[in-house]
Amino acid sequence: LLHARADGADVRMVYSVSDALELARANPERQVVFFGIGFETTTPPTALGILEAQRSGLDNFSVFCNHVLTPAAMKAILNVAADAGEGETLEVDGFSGPSHVSVIMGSDAYRFCARQYHKPVVIAGFEPLDVLQAILMLVRQLNQGRTDIENQYTRAVTPEGNRKAQAAVAEVFELRPSFEWRGLGAIPRSALGIADAY
């Protein structure tokens, strides 16, 4: 994008998809493309922006979608660890689950770690004491030989997550067959694309 801007393209940093929608409304003669990136936390606002653009007939607004999925990346890492050959080392003892991502997904989304890979997950909040407590909880699980999904961030994360946000994402997006991750390579079913209806 910096190169495009240097070549004369009108590239603007916006705080949110709402800002991009406002740019499209204010400039009906110009095509406004929102670069939708990020994990589960940033995906629902993009979905709502797409729905708003469709509802309001905003034909000069589009999204370049690069929303990715945390569980798929975790599975890819765990699969690499499981397939490590002699002389290769990639040991994963457990995960500290990301807080805001988990608010959307819910703690149940990590069950595969315990069931399929026998790895514990502790969802941590943002505050220093949250992080320390989550690390302690994870170390206790490891010391006790447990592989549970625990939620340190109970003040914000529920088992089911944010159902309204999940519904908006399910309506607007669909799984891509594969996505190329920087540093990880292609990971199957690890990103979202915009459904044909949008």
Which residues does each predicted region cover?
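The feature marks the mature, well-folded catalytic cores of soluble enzymes
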Residues: 1-27
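Short, solvent-exposed amphipathic alpha-helical segments in soluble enzyme
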Residues: 2-4, 48-55, 78-82, 110-116, ...
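Short gly/pro/ser/thr-enriched loop/turn and capping motifs at secondary-structure boundaries
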Residues: 20, 40-43, 69-73, 102-104, ...
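Glycine-rich, charged/polar anion/phosphate-binding loops
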Residues: 20, 71-77, 107-110, 168
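Active-site histidine-anchored catalytic micro-motif
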Residues: 26-36, 41-98
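A conserved active-site cap/scaffold subdomain adjacent to cofactor or substrate pockets
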Residues: 84-159
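Internal helical hairpin/lid segments
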Residues: 133-198
